[in-house]
Amino acid sequence: MDSVDRFLYTSDHDGFLALTRETWQNRWFPSQIPLHLDVSHVHQLSDADKDFYRFLFTFLGMAERLVNFNIEDLVTNFNSHDVAHYYAEQVAMENIHGVVYANILKIFFNNSRGELLAYAAKIILDPALCEKLEWLHSRVRKATTKAQKILMFLIVEGIYFISSFYSISLCRVRGIMPGVCLANDYISRDELLHTKAASMLYNTMVEIQEKPSHAEVQALFREAVNIEIRFIQAKAAGVTLVNVVDIRRFLEATADRILRDIFVPPIFGTPPPEACPLSYTGSFKAVNFFERDNSDYTTCVTDDL
């Protein structure tokens, strides 16, 4: 008879248990994102700005299906109650992200589903997006070992959306779209937690002899950063405050942070921009998440980069 251990819960990974509790403490819902003020701000955007953000939010709204990285398939590689519980929570949070992006897209497309679908069908053929997706799907197909799959998961969670989050956060600097900015804070912080989890998975659930060489991992991250910067560079011309040089610096600093987290030497040595608009960067938060509609997590984040 199979061991009954797999049916009866007992904590078997302190790190993932802590991450699950952190997710519980910081759970949020689409109803907490007020978008009524954002409607007039969207209408006031320049054509270049509106096109840029419509593109980003449509990409983000489709990302769960476009990226097609199956968390459940990954988790089946590990016989751990706490890992399975954490990733069940992560899937739930990703579903919330999808609902919020759908709400934001209603503003950008005047609540017209037909207009959104027509636009989505057009951008799915966009060369910058196609290159990004083709690179990812090619790499995912080549990832046959457990270690390689986790590294690709880490790329998706930690690098793949960073230029979009950074660009959206610039709206706060401009004093526009407060609901969108709040959602971006919540979602980017969730992704930071997801990156932390993927790093923990790599560090604690993969034997050292199974891991690729440092050089292979570094090459993968270098490719990912270059793909991401080309993606945003192709769309950023003429967009207010979007500085591709600063975004590259942030991407490189983020890649180095993740590499250090998985005990691989950093490759860029780039400091993040001094005036980084993503609020979790270098911040220290100790405010109860539910006291008010702000972007403070119950978890403290220090020296993120």
From Swiss-Prot:
The chain crosses the membrane at residues 150-170. Its cofactor is Fe cation. Fe cation 1 binds at E64, E94, H97. It is a single-pass membrane protein. Disulfide bonds: none annotated. It is found in: Host membrane. One of its GO terms (molecular function) is ribonucleoside-diphosphate reductase activity, thioredoxin disulfide as acceptor. The keyword Zinc does not apply. Ribonucleoside-diphosphate reductase holoenzyme provides the precursors necessary for viral DNA synthesis. Allows virus growth in non-dividing cells, as well as reactivation from latency in infected hosts. Catalyzes the biosynthesis of deoxyribonucleotides from the corresponding ribonucleotides. This is Ribonucleoside-diphosphate reductase small subunit. The gene is RIR2.
